[in-house]
Amino acid sequence: MGGSSYDVLRKQARSLENEIDLKLVAFSKIGAGSGGGGSGGLGGVDTSPLLGEHVFDSLSEEIEQMLEKLSSLNESMSDLPASGAAAMHTLQRHREILQGYRQEFNKICANHTMRIEREELLRGSGLATSSGSPSISGLNRREMYLKESGHLNSASHLVNDQINIAIETRDHLHAQRQAFKRLQTRFNDISNRFPLISSLIQRINIKKRRDSLILGAVIGFCVILLLLYAFN
């Protein structure tokens, strides 16, 4: 009886896993905005985003209930007496599948939330026109992303221009720094030359004094000779 109950629960779990798998595929498409009630056959234009959100929310609740049911089935199987290593392996596999489904479900919900916030941000920044509709007002997502890409490109060009200005300013400052270095070198050379000039002038003055002394001595000697000659 226990084995029969286990087989029934296992079949129910497999059937529910298949249903959840299909639901997650549809849920992912609706969350990405590429399917569901958000398209009205007008070339990809979102004509009824509120309906798409309603479908997403409804499917989200349905998948949550299915995941809870699958978790309950797994718990029921684990409560049955162990019937071998194969059964334990199968139960572990069902738990891993459930965990994978939960992760995928949370990932889809998070991506959908980010997409909605992104569209709200674009709408608030003026990338989408406002005509009273809660949608993106006639602009499909491709047009909206193209406009956003244009704004990003403009911002990128502006940043590049600012970077070029900064580089030119840096080069100009570097050139000024080199000019100041050259001036400083010249001043140092001049200051180093002044002691040499001063020393040269001092030597010239010493030589003049020495020549004056020699000339004075010669003149004095000549005067003495003349006086001696005159008195004799």
Curated annotation (Swiss-Prot):
Pfam family, one: V-SNARE_C
Entry keyword set: Coiled coil, ER-Golgi transport, Golgi apparatus, Membrane, Protein transport, Transmembrane, Transmembrane helix, Transport
Cellular-component GO terms for this entry: cis-Golgi network; Golgi medial cisterna; Golgi membrane; Golgi trans cisterna; membrane; SNARE complex
Record membrane topology: Single-pass type IV membrane protein
Annotated signal peptide: none
Predominant place of localization: Golgi
InterPro entries: Golgi_SNAP_su1
Assembly and oligomerization: Component of several multiprotein Golgi SNARE complexes.
Protein name from the UniProt record: Golgi SNAP receptor complex member 1
Organism of provenance: Drosophila melanogaster (Fruit fly)
Gene: Gos28
